Each structure stands twice: as structure tokens, then as C-alpha cells.
Amino acid sequence: MTALRICFVGDSLTAGTGDDRFLGWPGRLCQEERKRGHDLTCYNLGIRADTSTLIAPRWRAECTARLPDIYQGAIVFAFGNNDTAVQVGSDQVRVPLEESLATARAMLSGAKAWKPTLFIGPWPCEESKQPVNPSGLLGYDFRNTRIGEYNDAYAKLAGELGVPYLDLYGALGADPRWLQPSRAGDGIHPPAEGYSLVAEKVAGWAAWRRWLD
């Protein structure tokens, strides 16, 4: 049995937007690990529409408040989709690739020096439903070509830093079970079934298992 407090730091895909059970993949992941006998505390620090540059100013303070050094703590970053998005009416991505990489480097380096750290990359969008307009006010256009480009760059960066990286873009894109929930969602946020599949991918990831088993 492993006792561990974990901060899941990210955006709406971390928060679980679109999941009618409001668990997202972190809640489902930790729920299943509890069934295996592990004593996990799950802190979901996902904020809708956050990019890497919006996460960067907040992650350390939010994690510090939840991970006192007297307890075993760890951090899982999960971001990138919003960096690749183009806001409707603009012709620029929200965070250019080089800026996104520099921001990710600073966060991952700082986190790794403090706590065990994992990085989970962006996942594929459903292009037939673009742009995504959940609020009715702002629309964001996601494209898999851009997501794939950022994903490859994040994977390379994580390798350089020695931070384990989960390529969800590849893992979900290659899994036929992703097709239905991807199409059933709004174009980027799947319903519950999609988050369950993401939780399954994380649960089977060797880097995650090393924390627990």
C-alpha cells in the first residue's frame, strides 16, 4: 500500500469538463487505485481554458499548500491542448510553440527538483466539431496537426529533462475505443467514457505504476 498526495495540474481536460460525474480522469484514476489498496489524496488543479503560461504563475503556490514536506507528495502536469488552439477571430495560436516549450521547461524543472513529477501530453481533438464554443462567448479552434506538433516537442523536452512523458495523442489516436467518446463530446471534451479511457491509459503507464507498486 502506498500513501501519496498528488496534485494534478492542468486545464479543463484535467478538471473533467463534459463528465457528468465530475470526476474527470484524475478522479477515476485515484478511485481505481484506492480499490487496489493505495491511500491516495487527489487534488484536481485543473482550470478551464488554461494554457501553459496561465498555469505557470499558479502551480507552485497551489501545490505547496497541498503538499507539505512531512507527507509523500507528487505532481502530475497535464496541459498543451489550449496552447495549440486558435481563438476564433484570430490567426495566432494562443501560445506559440517556442514559448510553450520554454514555459514547460521552467515548470517541469522546478517541479522535478522538488517532488516526483510526471507530464501528460495533449490528446486528439474531433475536427468535425471545431471550433469548440462551450461558453457561447469565446470559440477555440483545435487541429490535430498542431496538437501533434506540440506533442512531439513536449515529448522531446521531457526526455531531455528526465521527466516521464505520456503520449496521449498517440495512445488515444491509436485506440478505436476513443472514436465514439471523442465524437460524442464537444470537439475536445469527451463525456464520461472518454475520461475513463484516459484514466485507463494513465493507470497502465509504467511511470505511474512506479509511484505505487
Describe each model-derived feature in a short phrase.
Residues 38, 57-213:
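Alpha-helical cap/lid subdomain in secreted, periplasmic
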